[in-house]
């Protein structure tokens, strides 16, 4: 029976993905309009194929939009498949008294397995016996711990122990880095810890992004408004159904139904879906150039609206490369400590050593104490450094702590001046092991006494000039307890280790621990040759007997350092009103220290109620948890379930949550968050569950992405304002002509041309608007803030009403005021359907012949020119054209030129004149078009002035977050 394999769901069929693209209100409205237009075209008299232009164009747009949507679709299926990579392929199992290799998926609870260094754990297992002095597992992929974890067979009595504290359990998907052991399988398949992550990913229902939700709400509102207006227009004309001009009640009803459909086509921003997709796609290109690869288009905007970033610590805020920061030994007088600062935070074997700002060179030559420390670090070490010539980066093969010590040895150099001169001329890539090799050749290795959990140390036996020395490294509290002597000063005279010396060193260890540094003590035993246990030691107790009466040489303090640019990034997030919450599996002291260094906490800030461990958080009631997440900025010793819970709580408070991470353990929370941000060097599971991947693993890139996201949202509002005000203008135009009883000024094919081509090009160009100057000093938008707020709606209506009125007035002008026109009265124009009965002398054919087409051309040209001017207005929501001129966005300049060129094409190319039922304009008509269109700029400048005065509040009155005042921008 296949117990271990994780269940796989079948892939989503293509037809389902395509169908999903049509579950959008705007798309459904367009689909309905296309259907009605097609039916009306079938009943059109004559063989005029232009009747089918409307439905064909609409359907073409819908198909193109669906293709783009399916192409961009990213599902959890790939993430689930990637989880299989973290499942071991085979396992060594004891069955029927025989040891055999079987497929890991065939394991069942109760199987006894053997596992050793380099193996991937095939199932969740309970340790039975350890066949080596120590047994360590790298479980960062599951828990996020920056160091490998020592395991043992002792029982854990705490039933609520988190995974990090379950030291007798091996978790499926983690890797053994040291030792050999026997274990019994307890959980397989979906029941394992990694199986739980699989279950979390598959069970989650993807929530719509804030932008998608707002567009859906906007679509719902638009659907209702369009339906009401269309029905209203049809009903107010019921009395005209029997007018002689229509030739019967039924034909009159169909005629006004066509007008109602025209109204529907006019009201729907056909180009909106394509323009939004294009805008987001352009945003992804910009962000990719800045090392942020977006896997889901709507997430571009979503990141711009996030109010909380939940960040994993290890590998995200930190380098995930242990590095030594401090080198310490007692000074010559023994009343203080000599502290040497070490430069560099990666595994690159280069960096200066300094004391009080003064650079120190050839330390191993000038200081016997430092030389002895280098000897211990070089010999008590099984890690190796590696260099990738392609990326130019350095890495560690083995324990990260030992890798950090190896790097320090190379930074210190050898105890030979001539060797050092040659050594430091070499590039870092060629001196990965040069200094270490020097000490290894001087001190041949005789024996290794492996690390054990009980004595918290390891040692090596070396020889020099026929003398034998024991070099030891380990936890300071354990080493200090077993030391009898200590070296004083740089030249290292050995003196007894008194209580005063011991207390001085112990205080430094505590101080370093509070700062998040991991401290390693270095010691030696010089007169070891006479110890009878030297060649017979077999147990850790005997190893401990060897490691007695030691001489303490010094201490080293190391940490997984924060990335240098993270502090500035956190500062920018605060200025943007974004909370940064750190969620890590690491211990509290280390996490709090890192948080203080990067600015999440102040240097001396009281962390009461702001820092919780996973266990402390679990002990809270639901209401207390909700209160905790309002203030807390750090959660340490957490498990994957904590991350998902925190995302739920934050979202329930109305926050838009971004979650960063790089491990398998992060995947469920990455998927649940409004936007998941994975690291480029992270696991495939994390990357495939995320919406965005940071190729440079740089938390600071998120700040760039936030700014781009905010800019995209602002631009989205601008081109929606631009498109909708145009649509409102068209609706007002059709409604006014119908209400006034005038002939239709614009026909559906003209409206489609304006909506798709003439408007579409500038709308797309608005995506290139540069961000407003204060875009990163505004408070984040609230989750429930509508895309179209009250003020924005008023602006839509104000501009739209003018657009519609100007379009209708252009039609009226041609018939009533144009010196080259018929100059009939307005009453005659508004009663054209009674022309044959009441005033046939004017020539009723003018309402359907070339005169009508000329008037319609004036209306269409006014609409187009106003929209070009309106596009200029949309450069900024509140900044005047005088302060934010047109050439700030040259793409818009080109778009306006192209749109006008296309308009001239339909005006002056005969075939297109026929298609759009228009005629060329003369100079008199063009002057009228420009005069009627120009006031829209002045109107919008007044509205911008009002927004600056009334809706942009002074910063002191703005929202405050993390002690920073913000200037809110209102829609």
UniProtKB/Swiss-Prot annotation:
Binding-site residues, ATP: 314, 402, 453, 473, 518, 637, 643, 665
GO cellular component: endoplasmic reticulum membrane; membrane
Binding site for Ca(2+) 2: 727, 730, 758-759, 867
PROSITE patterns xrefs: ATPASE_E1_E2 (PS00154)
Record CDD domains: P-type_ATPase_SERCA
GO BP annotations listed: calcium ion transmembrane transport; intracellular calcium ion homeostasis; response to unfolded protein
SUPFAM superfamilies, per database record: Calcium ATPase, transduction domain A, Calcium ATPase, transmembrane domain M, HAD-like, Metal cation-transporting ATPase, ATP-binding domain N
Entry keywords, A to Z: ATP-binding, Calcium, Calcium transport, Endoplasmic reticulum, Hydrolase, Ion transport, Magnesium, Membrane, Metal-binding, Nucleotide-binding, Translocase, Transmembrane, Transmembrane helix, Transport, Unfolded protein response, Virulence
Subcellular location: Endoplasmic reticulum membrane
MF (Gene Ontology): ATP binding; ATP hydrolysis activity; metal ion binding; P-type calcium transporter activity
UniProt: Mg(2+) binding residues: 312, 314, 662
Protein name according to UniProt: Endoplasmic reticulum calcium ATPase srcA
Binding sites annotated in the UniProt record for Ca(2+) 1: 265-266, 268, 270, 755, 759
Entry function: Magnesium-dependent enzyme catalyzes the hydrolysis of ATP coupled with the translocation of calcium from the cytosol to the endoplasmic reticulum lumen. Its activity is coupled to the unfolded protein response (UPR) and Ca(2+) import into the endoplasmioc reticulum is important for redox homeostasis, virulence, cell wall biosynthesis, and resistance to antifungal compounds that inhibit Ca2+ signaling. With pmrA, promotes radial growth and conidiation.
Observed effect of gene inactivation: Leads to severe polarity defect, hypersensitivity to ER stress, and attenuated virulence; when prmA is also deleted.
List of catalytic residues: 312 (4-aspartylphosphate intermediate)
